[in-house]
Regions:
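Coupling/switch/interface segments within P-loop NTPase motor domains and analogous charged loops
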Residues: 1-31, 179-180
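Coupling/switch segment of ABC-type P-loop NTPase heads
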Residues: 1-8, 152-155, 160, 172
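C-terminal alpha-helical "lid" subdomain
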Residues: 164-180
Length: 180
């Protein structure tokens, strides 16, 4: 019951995850029609997100069997590369969706996605840089609502928004120099 509730909150188009003869099945509601799917038929992004949500919910239910709503459990969850396999649009909402589904959980996540970074307040971010084999925290002046290119340059430390090694980029750079 807790797992089903978590899946429904996190992914409203999906419901009723259940064991089947072969693996796990889930119902997908789209365009007024429900389709039964095997987990294997879903994209890696949906599979990893469903697995993560079902795992967190199962652990909450197991740790609090007498709690009326185990999704209200307090705790800390670590997630490495929370954006892994997710479409950029979903990367923008994954943390908000997780916090809505598990409101009393503190999520500690790693990411290299400007989409994820731009969904978080700067005071909640820790950018770690390694200098001389020592970790160093870099202050983040802004993040929430920032454009991806700005996050890449100013938060994630990407040197250029373009792939400088591409011939077309080098030609464009040369053209701009000639014009200037």
């Amino acid at each position: 019951k807790t797992i089903r509730h978590a899946v429904q909150k996190m992914l409203p188009d999906f419901s009723n995850p259940r064991g089947a003869e072969v693996g796990i099945q889930i119902d997908w509601f789209q365009n007024g029609k429900t389709t039964q799917l095997r987990i294997e038929q879903l994209s890696d992004g949906y599979r990893t997100t469903l697995a993560m949500v079902m795992d967190i919910a199962a652990r909450m239910a197991e740790a609090n069997p007498d709690m009326p709503d185990p999704l209200q459990t307090e705790g800390v969850v670590l997630i490495d590369e929370v954006d892994l396999h997710l479409h950029p649009g979903w990367q923008q909402t994954i943390l908000l969706d997780l916090m809505r589904t598990f409101p009393n959980i503190q999520f500690i996540v790693s990411t290299h996605s400007p989409q994820v970074v731009s969904s978080v307040k700067p005071e909640c971010l820790r950018v770690i840089d390694w200098l001389d084999e020592q970790p160093r925290l870099i202050p983040v002046p802004f993040s929430e609502g920032a454009e991806a290119q700005q996050v890449l340059l100013d938060v994630l430390g990407v040197k250029s928004p373009r792939v400088e090694q591409l011939e077309i980029v080098q030609k464009l750079k040369k053209y701009q120099q000639l014009v200037d």
